[in-house]
Amino acid sequence: MANIKSQQKRILTNERRRLRNKSVKSSLHTAVRGFRAAVEAGDKDKAGELLASTSRKLDKAASKGVIHKNQAANRKSALAKALQKI
């Protein structure tokens, strides 16, 4: 454990952020997995709805600093491409 008071506080904030980031990334992973399952099933309507919700989640994660904005853009592009292939 750190001896400096500011570092003790930093340890606590880092842990809170780590847990928040873990939660957001987990929900992103679940959303993308659901979208890919709909694409593999060939359900274009459901995949379109899931693409919109997944894109919102990616944008929100990027705006909160959980993932980089370019990573969000690349993932959204790949998902849109997958939808177009149906």
Swiss-Prot record:
Any one cellular-component term (Gene Ontology): small ribosomal subunit
Pfam family of the protein (one): Ribosomal_S20p
Gene name for this UniProt entry: rpsT
Family per record: Belongs to the bacterial ribosomal protein bS20 family.
Name of the protein described by the UniProt record: Small ribosomal subunit protein bS20
HAMAP family, A to Z: Ribosomal_bS20
GO molecular function: small ribosomal subunit rRNA binding; structural constituent of ribosome
Sorted UniProt keywords: Ribonucleoprotein, Ribosomal protein, RNA-binding, rRNA-binding
GO biological process, one term: translation
NCBIfam families linked: S20 (TIGR00029)
InterPro entries hit by this protein: Ribosomal_bS20, Ribosomal_bS20_sf
Function: Binds directly to 16S ribosomal RNA.
Disulfide bonds: none
Source taxonomy: Bacteria, Bacillati, Actinomycetota, Actinomycetes, Mycobacteriales
